[in-house]
Amino acid sequence: KLNNFFEEIPEIFTNNNKKVKLIFKKHKEDFEILANRNKLIQVFINLIDNSISLSPEGSKILIQLDKLDEKFISLRFYDQGKGVDLKDSEKIFQRFYSDRQENIKNHTGLGLSIAKEIIEHLNGNIILDKSNKSDYPGACFLITLPIKQ
C-alpha cells in the first residue's frame, strides 16, 4: 500500500543538512502495486537525494500521488532547485551522465539510471516532466506504475 509506504520515507531524510522539507500529497484511495519494497525505496532515495543536493537550504520537495486511470498511478516529484533542461530529458537517465557544475559529494551519475531500470522492471515508466507548479519551479520527475489488479 502506497500511503503506508509514504509514512516511512520522511524518517530517512529528517536530518538532511539543508533542512529541506518533504511534503507528501496522498490520494484519497490507497493503491497497492506489485513492487519490491526495498527497490522502490531505492528509487525514492535517489530522487529525493538528488532534489536535496540541488535545492536551496530550507526549500521543499513535493511528492504527489494520483490515479491516472483504472490501471496506473502516477507519482510526481517536484522540487525548488535549479531544475533540469528538458533537452537533457533522455541523457539524465544514462549511466554516469551529469549536468552538475558543482562538486557534489557522493555523486556517481548512476542514481537516475538505476531508478529508471527499477521502474521499468516494475512495468512502469519514469520521465523528466515540465513542472506545472509555480511554487516548485525546479525539476519534476513523473513515475507511472501499474496498480495491482
Kindly give the residue locations of the regions a language model identified.
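Conserved catalytic submotifs in the C-terminal HATPase_c
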Residues: 21-31, 68
